[in-house]
């Protein structure tokens, strides 16, 4: 039976460390601020925005919400981003995705100052991740690394398999594992021998958005299994991309859904915002 990797506990430690550093900066008169922009009234986006504001309050940051109507034009949003780029109170800018269809998401991401791009989506920061000279780490992959480290697993030389090649998780995840000297394989919808590849993984990270896709016969005995997926079943329950009940019997460590990777994403967003404030004030 696998050991459970408790994302709530690990994320609480990350946030507590951020809170202590933020308090030390506040004592020097340095306030930290995160601007969160939401366009339209997507219920899921509203939940995410509220959780980010709550996390800011927990760690002692100021949060600034900008709620724009669904019909906002691309130029109007670009104008707001420009204002926030120049705002000294704002250390991080987060534009909640998805955006309405009339707005080009890439144009907005590219307009955010790389120094305030705490999601690490800007091409400049993506390039920095590629060469291993990063200030900001993409929040979900960075959170996954913290969870792997919490198990005491040494990534060096391990067979690491990432299922999924998205720009947000799969690609940067593979880079972070590679920078730690993992032997990395990326699998995707066109991979022909997926089962055989996964069964060799010492560390398996799954991020494809397909409920219970990874079954026990795809998992190596004693593997570390990180489930990034979040799917809602017909009965309303949440589940990941891994068949938890079956894989748990075979894995060495496994993340639950919910309560695994999810809490880490917001914790790492707080860490990136702190990093931005420290960089701005010449502390790193």
Where are these regions (language model features)?
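Short glycine-rich, flexible loops that bind phosphorylated cofactors or substrates
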Residues: 101-102, 212-214, 233-234
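Glycine-rich phosphate/diphosphate-binding loop of Rossmann-like nucleotide-binding domains
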Residues: 39-53, 135-224, 237-245
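Short glycine-/small-residue-rich Rossmann-like dinucleotide-binding loops
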Residues: 98, 208-210, 229-230
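Short beta-strand elements in bilobed, periplasmic/extracellular small-molecule ligand-binding domains
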Residues: 34, 56-70, 184-186
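Short, well-structured alpha-helical segments in soluble
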Residues: 76-88
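Positively charged, low-complexity intrinsically disordered leader regions
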Residues: 1-30
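Rossmann-fold NAD(P)-binding glycine/threonine-rich loop
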Residues: 106-117, 122, 126, 229-281
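Anion-binding alpha/beta catalytic cores of soluble intermediary-metabolism enzymes, centered on
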Residues: 94-155
């Amino acid at each position: 039976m696998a050991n459970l990797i408790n994302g709530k506990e690990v994320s609480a430690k990350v946030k507590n460390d951020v809170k202590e550093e933020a308090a030390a900066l506040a004592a020097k008169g340095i306030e930290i601020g995160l601007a969160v922009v939401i366009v339209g009234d997507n219920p899921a986006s509203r939940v995410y925005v509220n959780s980010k504001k709550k996390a800011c309050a927990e760690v002692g940051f100021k949060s600034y919400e900008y709620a724009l109507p669904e019909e906002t034009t691309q130029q109007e949003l670009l104008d707001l981003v420009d204002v926030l780029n120049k705002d000294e109170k704002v250390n991080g800018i987060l534009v909640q995705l998805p955006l309405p269809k009339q707005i080009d998401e890439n144009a907005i991401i590219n307009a955010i100052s790389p120094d305030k791009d705490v999601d690490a989506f800007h091409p400049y920061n993506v390039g920095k991740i590629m060469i291993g000279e990063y200030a900001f780490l993409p929040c979900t992959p960075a959170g996954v690394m913290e969870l792997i480290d919490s198990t005491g697993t040494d990534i060096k030389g391990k067979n690491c398999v990432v299922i999924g090649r998205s720009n947000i998780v799969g690609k940067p995840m593979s880079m972070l594992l590679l920078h730690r000297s993992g032997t990395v394989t990326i699998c995707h919808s066109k991979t022909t021998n997926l089962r055989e590849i996964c069964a060799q993984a010492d560390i398996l990270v799954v991020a494809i958005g397909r409920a219970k896709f990874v079954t026990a016969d795809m998992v190596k005995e004693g593997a570390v299994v990180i489930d990034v997926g979040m799917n809602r079943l017909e009965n309303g329950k949440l589940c990941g991309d891994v068949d938890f009940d079956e894989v748990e019997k075979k894995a060495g460590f496994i993340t639950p859904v919910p309560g695994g990777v999810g809490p880490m994403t917001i914790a790492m967003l707080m860490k990136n915002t702190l990093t931005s404030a420290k960089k701005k004030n010449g502390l790193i």
